[in-house]
Amino acid sequence: MTDLAQRIQRLEDIEAIKKLKARYWFACDRRDADAVKQCFVSDDLLIDFGFIGQFTDIDEFLELFMQMTNKPSHIDLHHGLAPEISIDGDDDASGRWRMQFQLIETETEVAQFMGGYYEDDYRRENGEWKIATTRYHLTFNLMLQKDAVGALKLIEMGAVPGLASEA
């Protein structure tokens, strides 16, 4: 492969990984477990979400994910930012992303704003990039709840682990 062809392939791989991560976050927001599952490798997987847990089995992760999110009162948005992606070999890559997360839990009247970053490893499987390892590092958490008179009350502030679904 020529130098130009290699550079083009590298850019196409980076773009494919960006689209993969966007599909993953969109599937999370839509609570589409099948679409989330399609974003991950079929074996040798690690999902490490710190205070939420570590998983090497995608189905175990999806079971908890659906328990936490699959209710009409749970409305969330994942925003991935500032990707740094490195193609480490023909079928291996790594990346780091900033992530901002907003959640409104209408049943408990809680709003949550979280930020942090992901560190990922990717592997090409059957010609398609997949997430092999993902680690989320929480750097800030702000949780507010509406009180009886409609004012917002601060529940958590800082890098305190916690979820609006637990409030």
Outline where the language-model segments fall:
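A structural signal for alpha-helical segments
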Residues: 12, 53-56, 110
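Short, low-complexity N-terminal intrinsically disordered segments enriched in polar/charged residues
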Residues: 1-26, 30, 34-38
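A beta-strand edge to alpha-helix "cap/lid" segment located at domain peripheries
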Residues: 3-5, 70-167
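Solvent-exposed, flexible loop/coil residues
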Residues: 15, 51, 59, 140, ...
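Short, well-structured alpha-helical interface segments that form or flank functional binding sites
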Residues: 19, 56, 117
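A solvent-exposed, acidic/Ser-Thr-rich amphipathic alpha-helical stretch
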Residues: 33-99
